[in-house]
Amino acid sequence: MKLAVIGGDGIGPEVTAEALKVLNAVRDDIEVTDYDLGARRYLRNGELLADADLVSLREHDAILLGAIGAPGEVPPGVLERGLLLKMRFALDHHVNLRPSKLYPTATSPLANPGDIDFVVVREGTEGLYCGNGGTLREGTPHEIASEVSQNTRYGVERVVRDAFERAQNRKKHLTLVHKTNVLVNAGGLWQRTVNEIATEYPEVTVDYNHIDAATIYMVTDPSRYDVIVTDNLFGDILTDLAGAVTGGIGLAASGNIDATGVNPSMFEPVHGSAPDIAGQGIADPTAAILSAAMLLRHVGDESNAQRIEAAVTYDVAERPAGPVKTVEVGDRIVAALQR
């Protein structure tokens, strides 16, 4: 397997090193190419993501990302638009996949969280994040700023189909989250698409939540969810809330997926670069390791994906109270693989 690794900034290289340690413990055929992308490169020479980088990345089977960002050093939006979103659009990562599971001994802020185990399938290349907007009369009392939410039948249908496929292979329940009572045009497109595709999946039950109601249910009754499908902005908000109710983003993994398989998909922990703890060896690499498991599942290695997830579940349950070193977490999970 040809694997592109973008360690990135802050704790990114530290957690990806442990994810690679675990990957190499279950497979002996991984060829790694490291890429110097992120704030460090931008601050050094002003480069973000060159066309040559994209050409090279496309030659790999998958991409593992650590974290990108340098708060206070790089202005907001530079790395997001010039690197992360550019890569997402260029590699057609139209499915953003975020599993949310409450692991044993993980502490949820909810008094009675129940059995939380759902996935959010977020559309990744359209909506309000497509860059369709602008500003007029900037800096004047009459300034106008607009952001246009772009939703196409093609874009909506392919992510809805992906969500139905996942629901078919899970607990067979899908929830559309939107705001159809106000966003009647985009919401209507999403609702019609779900209704039409639902006829192809008679075993999957379907319901609908407004986004504001979904934020309530995710706190009061998160176990009601199996697969959530939603647009780019609503998915961005919901997945952070999902991370919070399952004990924090330290265990939150994600995938940015081209479901067609034409381009390599990218897998990453949800957390940021955390420069305040970088280099101290205390960052929790569990989310990066779970992202590696998602990566293996995507490339068809279900057996080893399940092995890693089982090892993580065992380690989280047995992990001692108090801080655990980054390297030690990786070593513990490798040891758990041998059980």
UniProtKB/Swiss-Prot annotation:
The keyword Manganese applies. It is found in: Cytoplasm. It catalyses: (2R,3S)-3-isopropylmalate + NAD(+) = 4-methyl-2-oxopentanoate + CO2 + NADH. The record marks Y129, K179 as: Important for catalysis. Its EC number is 1.1.1.85. Pfam families: Iso_dh. Coiled coil: none annotated. Its cofactor is Mg(2+); Mn(2+). GO terms for molecular function: 3-isopropylmalate dehydrogenase activity; magnesium ion binding; NAD binding. Keywords: Amino-acid biosynthesis, Branched-chain amino acid biosynthesis, Cytoplasm, Leucine biosynthesis, Magnesium, Manganese, Metal-binding, NAD, Oxidoreductase. NAD(+) binds at G272, S273, A274, P275, D276, I277, A278, G279, Q280, G281, I282, A283, D284. Mg(2+) binds at D212, D236, D240. One of its GO terms (biological process) is L-leucine biosynthetic process. InterPro entries: ICDH/IPMDH (IPR050501), IsoCit/isopropylmalate_DH_CS (IPR019818), IsoPropMal-DH-like_dom (IPR024084), LeuB_actb (IPR023698). Its main location: cytoplasm. Belongs to the isocitrate and isopropylmalate dehydrogenases family. LeuB type 2 subfamily. This is 3-isopropylmalate dehydrogenase. The gene is leuB.
